[in-house]
């Protein structure tokens, strides 16, 4: 079975591949957008993570005829009423500029005390099949915002986020966790694992 991940993000691709491997889904051939005939990527103008994930998954399966999985994710900061939210990747105005996004968020939270720095990573993953079926899973990873970046692993807001599991432990940011540790805890890992059973069913029937 071929499975398209509607992304060219190498780290997301590796993350999904690890989860498929852990589930023993050796029959699934994972593809990225660069592996299929190019198509115009849709405008992500949804109001929610689920909206945007559906937009991307539907575009992938429509243009390629291949079962497609897509995610939309970001960080929701309690003090900012859930923002950046769906705007996380372009919070500073430039899409995908992690450094600028992190710097802006830190500046906005500069005078906020520790007890009001609660945040959560949120991910919604959608699996869209050629027959029109869609399956949706959401993952949520609670924690707090740090006052400066820590760690070199991960991407996005990982260096600014201390997971709830680490607050009373070693105090590591999500950018200091190993890939395996992050897979086990993270919002995207939760959502992707929620789709594994359905992927296995589709693979067995193909």
Curated annotation (Swiss-Prot):
<dbReference type="GO" id="GO:0036220">
    <property type="term" value="F:ITP diphosphatase activity"/>
</dbReference>
<dbReference type="GO" id="GO:0000166">
    <property type="term" value="F:nucleotide binding"/>
</dbReference>
<keyword id="KW-0479">Metal-binding</keyword>
<dbReference type="Pfam" id="PF01725">
    <property type="entry name" value="Ham1p_like"/>
</dbReference>
<feature type="active site" description="Proton acceptor">
    <location>
        <position position="72"/>
    </location>
</feature>
<dbReference type="GO" id="GO:0035870">
    <property type="term" value="F:dITP diphosphatase activity"/>
</dbReference>
<feature type="binding site">
    <location>
        <begin position="187"/>
        <end position="188"/>
    </location>
    <ligand>
        <name>substrate</name>
    </ligand>
</feature>
<keyword id="KW-0546">Nucleotide metabolism</keyword>
<comment type="similarity">
    <text>Belongs to the HAM1 NTPase family.</text>
</comment>
<feature type="binding site">
    <location>
        <position position="73"/>
    </location>
    <ligand>
        <name>substrate</name>
    </ligand>
</feature>
<feature type="binding site">
    <location>
        <begin position="7"/>
        <end position="12"/>
    </location>
    <ligand>
        <name>substrate</name>
    </ligand>
</feature>
<dbReference type="GO" id="GO:0009146">
    <property type="term" value="P:purine nucleoside triphosphate catabolic process"/>
</dbReference>
<dbReference type="InterPro" id="IPR002637">
    <property type="entry name" value="RdgB/HAM1"/>
</dbReference>
<dbReference type="GO" id="GO:0036222">
    <property type="term" value="F:XTP diphosphatase activity"/>
</dbReference>
<feature type="binding site">
    <location>
        <position position="72"/>
    </location>
    <ligand>
        <name>Mg(2+)</name>
    </ligand>
</feature>
<dbReference type="GO" id="GO:0046872">
    <property type="term" value="F:metal ion binding"/>
</dbReference>
<feature type="binding site">
    <location>
        <begin position="155"/>
        <end position="158"/>
    </location>
    <ligand>
        <name>substrate</name>
    </ligand>
</feature>
<comment type="subunit">
    <text>Homodimer.</text>
</comment>
<keyword id="KW-0378">Hydrolase</keyword>
<keyword id="KW-0460">Magnesium</keyword>
<protein>
    <recommendedName>
        <fullName>dITP/XTP pyrophosphatase</fullName>
        <ecNumber>3.6.1.66</ecNumber>
    </recommendedName>
</protein>
<keyword id="KW-0547">Nucleotide-binding</keyword>
<dbReference type="InterPro" id="IPR020922">
    <property type="entry name" value="dITP/XTP_pyrophosphatase"/>
</dbReference>
<dbReference type="GO" id="GO:0005829">
    <property type="term" value="C:cytosol"/>
</dbReference>
<comment type="function">
    <text>Pyrophosphatase that catalyzes the hydrolysis of nucleoside triphosphates to their monophosphate derivatives, with a high preference for the non-canonical purine nucleotides XTP (xanthosine triphosphate), dITP (deoxyinosine triphosphate) and ITP. Seems to function as a house-cleaning enzyme that removes non-canonical purine nucleotides from the nucleotide pool, thus preventing their incorporation into DNA/RNA and avoiding chromosomal lesions.</text>
</comment>
<dbReference type="GO" id="GO:0009117">
    <property type="term" value="P:nucleotide metabolic process"/>
</dbReference>
<feature type="binding site">
    <location>
        <position position="182"/>
    </location>
    <ligand>
        <name>substrate</name>
    </ligand>
</feature>
<dbReference type="InterPro" id="IPR029001">
    <property type="entry name" value="ITPase-like_fam"/>
</dbReference>
<dbReference type="GO" id="GO:0017111">
    <property type="term" value="F:ribonucleoside triphosphate phosphatase activity"/>
</dbReference>
């Amino acid at each position: 079975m071929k499975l398209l991940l509607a992304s060219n993000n190498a780290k997301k691709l590796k993350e999904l591949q690890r989860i498929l491997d852990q589930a023993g889904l050796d029959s699934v051939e994972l593809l990225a957008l660069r592996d299929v005939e190019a198509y115009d990527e849709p405008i992500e103008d949804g109001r929610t993570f689920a909206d945007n994930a559906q937009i991307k998954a539907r575009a992938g399966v429509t243009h390629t005829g291949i079962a497609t999985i897509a995610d939309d994710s970001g960080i929701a900061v309690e003090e900012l009423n859930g923002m950046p939210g769906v705007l996380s990747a372009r919070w500073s105005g430039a899409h995908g500029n992690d450094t600028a996004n992190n710097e802006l968020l830190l500046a906005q939270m500069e005078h906020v005390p520790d007890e009001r720095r609660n945040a959560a990573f949120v991910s919604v993953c959608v699996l869209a099949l050629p027959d029109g079926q869609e399956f949706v899973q959401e993952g949520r990873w609670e924690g707090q915002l740090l006052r400066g970046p820590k760690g070199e692993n991960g991407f996005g807001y990982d260096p600014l986020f201390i997971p709830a599991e680490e607050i009373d432990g070693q105090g590591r940011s999500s950018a200091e966790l190993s890939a395996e540790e992050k897979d086990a805890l993270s919002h995207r890992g939760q959502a992707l694992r929620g789709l594994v059973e359905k992927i296995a069913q589709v693979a067995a029937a193909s």
